[in-house]
Swiss-Prot record:
Pfam families: Rad50_zn_hook, SMC_N. Residues 411-507 form the Zinc-hook domain. Its cofactor is Zn(2+). NCBIfam families: PRK01156.1. The gene is rad50. This is DNA double-strand break repair Rad50 ATPase. It comes from the Archaea. Gene3D superfamilies: Helix hairpin bin, P-loop containing nucleotide triphosphate hydrolases.
Amino acid sequence: MIIDRIRLINFLSHEDSEIFFDTGVNIIVGHNGAGKSSIIDAIRFALFGDKRTKKIEDMIRKGAKSLEVEMEFRHGGHTYIIRRSITRRSKNPESNAMIMVDGSALSQSVKDANDYIEKNIITKSKDVFLNSVFSKQGEMDDLISGDPARRKKLLDEILEIEKLEETYDVLKDVIDSLQAGISNLDYLISENERDRDDLRRYQDDVAELSKQIDQEEAIESDLLRKKEEASAEYNAVSKELIMLDATLKNMMSLSDEANRYEEEIRKIDGKLQEISGSTERYNEITSSKVYASRERIRGYWTDKGQIIDYRKMLKNIDGQVQSYEDNMKKAAELQADHDQYEIMQRRMDEIKHELDDLRTYESKYVSLINEIEQKKKKREEYRKKQKDLGDEISRTLGRAFANASELVAIYEEIRRDIDEINTDLGNLQVKIGALRQKEEEIRRNMNMLEGHNKCPVCGTDLGDEGSRRIREHYSEDLNRLNEEIDHLEREASAIDEKKRQLISMESYLAKGKIREYETYDRQMKDLEAQITDDENSLSTIAYKHTKYEQLDEEYRSMHLEDLRQKYTDWNNAMAVISNIGDIEALRKQKDEVSKKLKDAEDRTHEIESEFPDINSYTPSYIGKIEDEVRLLEPQIKLAEDLKRQRETLREKVKDLRSRSAGMDEIQKRKNELSVKASESETRLKYVEGQIQATLSSLSGKRSKVETLRSHVSEIEQRISDRERDIERMKKIEKAINDVKRIREAFGKNGVPAMIRQSVSDYLTAKTRDYLSSFDLDFDDISVDQDFNVTVYRGGVPEGIDSLSGGEKTAVAFAIRVAVAQFLNADLSLLILDEPTAFLDEERRNSLSDIIEYTLKDSSVIPQVIIISHHRELLASANVAIEVKKIGGRSVVSNAD
């Protein structure tokens, strides 16, 4: 992995910092608290989303709502861009992530980004990657400290060997837990032996009871056969008795039914005698001549009424014919006046229709005349108000303007001047703040120098002369800073006064003066356009106004009063003629009515000759005899129904008497069978008693067998369950032995020792390779399994404490690079955080030389990023970057 670029937006103290890296050595310098380590934090955040603060949102710069980190790097022949962001929310912060590969987006969520990095970029565990790439502050010093135990602990942590030793202790807990699970194995085996003895005893009892059950089941079978025979005999006798009893009951029922029918016949004869008088009266009426001719007599009275109606109709028709002829004559006399009236009326209707069509235009014409006059007056009012407002604005601003556009331009110019002044003031305040911060830092460093001769930044011993020179330098810087601050504050005060004047004018205009002036301008233009439109509209309808006045004059000059009455008389005459309709049809109707009158008179004469006393046979008389017949008809129908019922009942009595003969013989046979049925029932009950006793005995034995078999099943289940537990525990017992052997492998002399030996050999070889390029005063070096470092001078082994400061630094650096390459064979990036911490000047200079002559060669490690507050290292850098704190924010620039 080679990092090309990283950008920090609102990340910790960085507002917007972009850092470009290259292969070789990249050194980032700056004072403590300047924001150097934030760049390493940003790299870890980009790769893993790691945070160094308690809450992830605390990494957002104070006053900002969100942060963003974007890192571009190369890996495996591809170019990657990782972008992560955090946004403050009311409850939980919102995190987002995105990965692009060669310009194409691959993931759009935090989870997808983390999964992709783990599987395709890091490939190893996160801890291994971090331990190989990142060297924490103080590690270089720990690797060369005089305490072997401390050095061993540090390398164990980097190589994660302590996790293997933790596994040794964990496996002890696993073994103890497994041992607890098999503590009752012997008890389970003894319990199974005791249950097997009980099982054999219960099985013998079941066999004996089964033999007794077989014997009693044979007895039960014989008794069931006897019961079946007795039951068959009893059922046959009972069945015949039931049939005989049913036959007797049926015969008695038939005899009773015949008696009831004979009683009903006697009742019918009585009813027929009661209605004989009604029958005789019915026959008398229906056989008379008047009843037979009742419809003709009723028609006679109808004809008498129609004769009167026909005579009235003939008189009415004669009157209509005379009216028709009179009105035809009157209409002919008024025809000429009628035609003249219609001609004049049509012309008036035409004029009225045209006036209706033109009335809208006439109204619009009059309305436009009035509106044009009103709008001209309003336009003059707006012109006067705008002039008064313009004079007021000019006096306030102290400058004239010709129109609204010029006024807006003046307002925008004032706002731009205010923005420029604000920018100038902000820049001045930033400069003043930076100078005051620098002043405070100088005073703090001067206070730290009082009574001490050590560098307040790195703790280097300066001596008396060095301390004096630094104090003099600090005093000169303070005087220069105070003069510069005074000058900047005077400049800010003058600019601020100009700002107040501009804000006063801007505030005056912002209260709506521009909008009011523009409104008058717009209103006058709108009115001018409206007046023009109205005048154009007026010219287009002027000819319609002229035509309207001409037609109105013509309409008012026309008079129809003299002709209107004659026109009305003609219409009335024609209405009478129209109501009468076809005169020829009316005359034909007269002939038809005359014929109907003659036919009716002929029919009445015929009836009167046949019935001389016809006046006695009025319609009410005919209705009366018809009503009497209708009243008698139900009695006649009842007599007929009763006669039919009587004949039917006589036939039924005859049939029932025939079917109920022979009852005595059947009763005798029934008595004989009753005795036989009683004997069969006694035998059947005896056999059933014996069967019940046998079944009771069998039920008890079978219940006992089921109980015994249930005990057998329970015992077999217990034995089976224990066998499974015993088998499982034996497997656990075997597993315990296997785990014990595995635990031994994780012990001090097992896998950790093998790893330490492997690491020891690798570190020794790699350290020799790196140190061979240095001109050091010893022959060889070795790192043993406990990570003790031994050097050889002339073949004589010596401890690391025998080395000089520079030699220790070279050894520590070589071991750290070797450890990184052991963890990551493809190591292309190494990040060192404050490697000079706790190093004296000699060892810092040695480290600078090592970096220049070793790491600048990109064949060892292609890219190295170093964070330090010691500028001495810049001489060995391919890329030099400086971080400063200005106005509370970190600023990144190229180092001088």
